A protein has these predicted regions:
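Active-site HxH/HxHxD metal-binding segment of metal-dependent hydrolases
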Residues: 28-90
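Short gly/ser/thr-rich secondary-structure transition/capping motifs
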Residues: 19-27, 45-48, 79, 133-136, ...
Length: 230
């Protein structure tokens, strides 16, 4: 999301209908954010991942990677010319990317919420990274952890949900479940406190991790924070 604070209405049928999205301004100018960026990787096309401002601001020659042909056509319709679908072994330089199972809600919500994807990044000299994306904790995530054995995991765990159908991504309790299923991995928890239908705060994740005894490997970046040493 690159739009200014409050430029979009709240997500309907959810909590905090008095709040407009995004809830905060960007921590630094868009120009700084895009400096040095040569690839955009999209898990899906919901407004809290890529908004109209992003379509307008990102240079049209930017290289995009998306989950499927439908998303490719949508992104191209905004004037972008270099849009590719992630396959079984898509490469960016020496980094290999492949899709991982993902489900954006329970049996009620997964259809209206639409398709989404996780991604796994591998490199001969780097740790395997699994970006779970917008998914609930379910059997597919367990399979991903067993299949790819990631050493670094990024989790969207803001507990975003709707009055009918419940949550569409993980929450703080699910962070503990992932940590138990991947006992040697570092976890980076994101997608927090940014939009109206978030229900989990950084402090909630921190307290849950502390009680579970996993705070030493659960990291909760602040807005604008860059993590380099994984």
């Amino acid at each position: 999301m690159l739009g200014k604070k409050g430029c979009m209405p709240p997500f309907p049928f959810s909590r905090n209908q008095h709040l407009r999205n995004p809830l905060h301004e960007l921590p630094f100018p868009v120009e700084k954010m895009l400096k040095g960026v040569d690839v955009v990787l999209l898990t899906h096309l919901h407004d809290d991942h890529i908004d109209e401002a992003a379509y307008e601001i990102i240079p049209k020659d930017m290289r995009f990677f998306v989950q499927d042909e439908n998303d490719r056509q949508v992104v191209m319709s905004h004037g972008f010319n270099h849009v590719e679908v992630v396959g079984d072994n898509t490469r960016i330089g020496e980094v290999s990317i492949q899709k991982a199972e993902s489900q954006h809600g329970n049996f009620i919500m997964k259809y209206p919420a639409g398709h989404t994807a996780g991604y796994v990044f591998t490199h001969p000299q780097e740790k395997t990274l699994y970006h779970a994306g917008d998914t609930i904790w379910y059997a597919g995530v367990k399979r991903n952890l067993k299949r790819f054995r990631p050493e670094v995991i990024t989790l969207n765990a803001g507990g975003n949900g709707f009055r009918l159908g419940g949550r569409v991504i993980m929450n703080d309790e699910d962070v503990v479940k992932v940590a138990a299923a991947a006992p040697d991995a570092k976890l980076f928890v994101t997608h927090l406190e940014g939009v109206n239908h978030n229900s989990v705060t950084r402090e909630m994740v921190r307290k849950r991790a502390e009680v579970a005894g996993i705070l030493d490997r659960v990291f909760i970046p602040e807005d604008g924070e860059t993590v380099e040493d994984l």
